Amino acid sequence: MKINVKGVPETMIQTLYARAKETSKENPKIKDEMAVSIVKQLDYDFSEANEDRTMSLGVIARTIVLDKMVEEYLNTHKDTIVINIACGLDTRCYRMKGKYVRWYNLDLPETINIRKQFLKETGPIYQIAKSAMDESYRDDIQYHGENILVIIEGLTMYLSENDIKKMFSIIDFKNSTVMVEVMLPFVVKHIKEKSIEGSRAQFTWGIKNGKELEKLTPSFSFLKEVSLVEGMKQLMPIYHVLGKIPFVSHVSNKIIVLEKHI
C-alpha cells in the first residue's frame, strides 16, 4: 500500500519502522508484531529510517520507558481512560489491552485516515481525527469521572510554546495525569536526525525540565521526570556507566509526568 505524507505526519512511518526492525531481531528489547505487519504492507522507501541509528535507538528507548511507565500507572489505576495524543501508528493500546476502560487515539485527520487502513478500532479503542489544539475533541470522549491518563510522545518538539499552552489548557478533566516527552532546547538547536530532516519536519521547541514545564502549565503540578537513558541502558550496557554522567542524562529526551486534580 502506497502512502504519501510529508512533514511531521511522516515521522510516524519512521518510528513504526524502528519498532518493527527491533521486533524482528533475534533478541528484541520490545515486541511490536503489529508494527511488523504494517511495515510489510507499506510501499515506502525506508532507506533513510534504516540508516538513522540515532532515531531508531531513541524510538526504542522511548518505547521501553513509556511502556513501563504506562503499565505501572494502569496497574495501580484500574478505572482509567487513556488519551494518546499524536498517536500516529502507535500500537501501545494493544500491548496494554485489558488494563484500561477506554483508549482514545487522537491525531490529525490525514494521519487517522492512514491509521484506519491498518487498524480498525471500534472499542474499547477509539480514533479521533482532530488536532490536539482542537478543544472539541473532548466532546468525543466518553467520560464519567474516571482517571485520565494522557500520553504525548514525539510531538512537543515540533510545536511552539503557545501550542504547548493551548494543548494543556484543553486537558481539563479532573484527576488527569500527563506523560509527555520533551526535548532539551540545546538538542532542538544542534542535533539533527537524518530521517527526520528527510521528511522535512523540523524541531522547533524544547524545555529544560519538568519544573519549567510546570510554569507554562500552571493548572498542572510536576510529579517526576524519567530520562530516556533508562531505556538506553537496556539497548547499550555502556549507558549504565554513561547514565551516571549528569550531562548525558540531562541532554537526553525525558518523559515528564504532570498531574491535575480538580
Residue ranges and their predicted role:
Residues 158-173:
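A short, conserved alpha-helix within the catalytic core of class I
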